[in-house]
């Protein structure tokens, strides 16, 4: 093997290794179904202000009183911060209506919550919080 070939091989491997994390990040179309919209009304159970995406967990009670937790993925904390939001913009126990899109695989997350992507969250007072990556417009705070 020539010296130049070895150098090119090592450089190519290093470039691939550096790019792998970027290639691993999912896209909306790969994980969510834009044709399967969902709207749920419930109470915020918890918020996860973590990278690469923040999550809002909402407890939804059905007619029989059974509670189901929905896990709504949103934008990154950085993107939400640039829109003027922070980890305290929504509070645990707050009543909200969430619009979003179902996960394509239909499988719950490890904690059993229903997985979806959030487009917007509407507070009880009617103010909308933009949180998703698929909305056409960003509602004002």
Stretch-by-stretch model annotation:
Residues 50-60:
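Short aromatic-glycine-enriched beta-strand elements
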Residues 103-133:
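OB-fold/S1-family single-stranded nucleic acid-binding modules
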Residues 23-38:
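Short boundary/loop segments of OB/S1/cold-shock single-stranded nucleic-acid-binding domains
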């Amino acid at each position: 093997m020539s010296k130049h070939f070895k150098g090119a091989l090592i450089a190519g491997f290093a470039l691939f290794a550096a790019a792998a994390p970027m290639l691993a990040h999912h896209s909306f179309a790969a994980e969510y179904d834009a044709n399967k919209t969902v709207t749920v009304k419930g109470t915020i159970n918890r918020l996860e202000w973590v990278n690469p995406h923040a999550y809002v967990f909402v407890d939804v009670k059905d007619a029989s009183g059974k509670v189901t937790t929905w896990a709504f993925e949103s934008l990154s904390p950085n993107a939400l911060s640039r829109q003027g939001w922070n980890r305290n913009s929504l509070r645990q126990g707050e009543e909200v209506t969430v619009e979003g899109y179902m996960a394509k695989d239909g499988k719950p997350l490890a904690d059993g919550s229903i997985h979806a992507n959030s487009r917007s969250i509407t507070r009880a007072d009617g103010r909308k919080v933009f949180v998703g990556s698929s909305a056409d417009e960003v509602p004002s705070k």
